[in-house]
UniProtKB/Swiss-Prot annotation:
Gene Ontology biological process terms, A to Z: carbohydrate metabolic process; glycerol-3-phosphate biosynthetic process; glycerol-3-phosphate catabolic process; glycerophospholipid metabolic process; phospholipid biosynthetic process
Protein name (database record): Glycerol-3-phosphate dehydrogenase [NAD(P)+]
Catalysed reaction equations from the record: sn-glycerol 3-phosphate + NAD(+) = dihydroxyacetone phosphate + NADH + H(+); sn-glycerol 3-phosphate + NADP(+) = dihydroxyacetone phosphate + NADPH + H(+)
InterPro entries (alphabetical): 6-PGluconate_DH-like_C_sf (IPR008927), 6PGD_dom2 (IPR013328), G3P_DH_NAD-dep (IPR006168), G3P_DH_NAD-dep_C (IPR006109), G3P_DH_NAD-dep_N (IPR011128), NAD(P)-bd_dom_sf (IPR036291)
Positions bound to sn-glycerol 3-phosphate: 105, 136, 138, 191, 244, 254-256
Enzyme Commission number(s): 1.1.1.94
Amino acid sequence: MHIAVLGAGSWGTTLAVLLARKGHAVKLWAHRPEFARTLQAERENTRYLKGTLFPDSLEVVGDLDGCIAEAEMIVTAVPSQALRETARAFSSLPFQGKIIVNVAKGIEVGSGMRMTEVLMDELPGLQPGRVAALYGPSHAEEVAREQPTTVVASSPSMETAEAVQEVFHTSRFRVYVNTDIVGVEVAGSVKNIIAIAAGISDGIGFGDNAKAAIITRGMAEISRLALKLGGDPMTISGLSGIGDLVVTCLSRHSRNRFVGEELGRGRSLDDIITHMNMIAEGVLSSKAVYALSSSLGVEMPITQAVYEMLFEAKPVEQAILDLMTREPKPERD
């Protein structure tokens, strides 16, 4: 199959390599033409995925039109807040009939839209049954080294979800399917915010009790928002929910946990972001999800605390005190 992967960061590069290793003809699009030329010449992404060599069937290009033209499937792997701009750039190209698989995790600032909603908004000819999300506990560094990984392909159309499953599934990259794309996308987006909170706990020096509480109560927040938006709370117990939440809150590879840890140690957000090589999606997602939850009347205190620490300069100690001194209540409320 001819596949276009849009976005040459660590995850886009990893998936392009995985697909090429499986025998697909893959074009990896890089936003900056000079970066595309460097990757094509060096046959390795030393900036984002050092040590993973490109298979012969992987071509890196800077021409979006040429990348899309032959593709039967398009994988969008650009940062979540850049997805609208990218989709708009190929909205006039012949994408009809192609399956579009989004792998970026986030909620758009301003609109409060999930990533597949952004795609539908910018691509009027895109049918809901031709779009999918591929989410789950899947750090690029481990997938690139072919360490066992499981994810879920979700689409309103089971036929599309199964088509994505067939394209991506390998003996080291197991793909499940479901049709609850709302639950999958909400879980994959909010977990990054909860991971920032988990990182803050690490940075301050709190123990396992605090981390367990953040993960568990974070799951409750994800479930409440997913249910309000029409998702199935049971999805949160799956790979895109608890699976991705645990790995993002605990892993040394997690950018979002790293941001939180550095905040907990006293560094400013601006300083952390300036010196990071990659994007931590949870930072801007906290702004989008807090606004969305507030407008819907969904209580998400951990999300609110992260937002206030990141964007309202609320002291970490005060945010923790506010969380711990909230009115006592039943666990399932």
